[in-house]
Regions:
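Short, charge-rich amphipathic alpha-helices with coiled-coil/heptad character
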Residues: 1-13, 41-45, 82-83
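N-terminal acidic leader/helix
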Residues: 5-36, 70-71, 75-77
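Short E/K-rich amphipathic alpha-helical oligomerization segments
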Residues: 28-53
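Residue-level signature of transmembrane alpha-helix interfaces in integral membrane proteins
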Residues: 47-49, 77, 82
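Amphipathic alpha-helical coiled-coil segments
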Residues: 59-79
Length: 83
């Protein structure tokens, strides 16, 4: 395995920052879409059996993105410590 150059660490950090920022923006879009769907159907209680499937799926996707953001933030912290 080749050693990481000093220039590679900042590039990695910049890429991670950009990716995290993009994913946070997508989470905000999903939040908006979820709210729109809940308003459209008039059902916002997720435990309601009539809760919209679209909103449920969007919530799952949002959760996955949030988990990815958490993982990337830990990678970023490791990268920052290596710099």
């Amino acid at each position: 395995m080749q050693p990481t150059s000093r220039l590679e660490i900042p590039r990695t950090a910049i890429k991670l920052h950009a990716l995290i920022s993009d994913l946070r923006w997508r989470v905000q879009l999903l939040d908006s879409d979820i709210q729109d769907e809940e308003k459209r159907t008039g059902i916002s209680n997720i435990s309601n059996t009539a809760y919209p499937i679209l909103a449920r799926n969007l919530r799952i996707r949002r959760g996955n993105l949030l988990a990815t953001i958490t993982m990337l933030e830990s990678q970023l912290a490791e990268t920052d410590m290596a710099a």
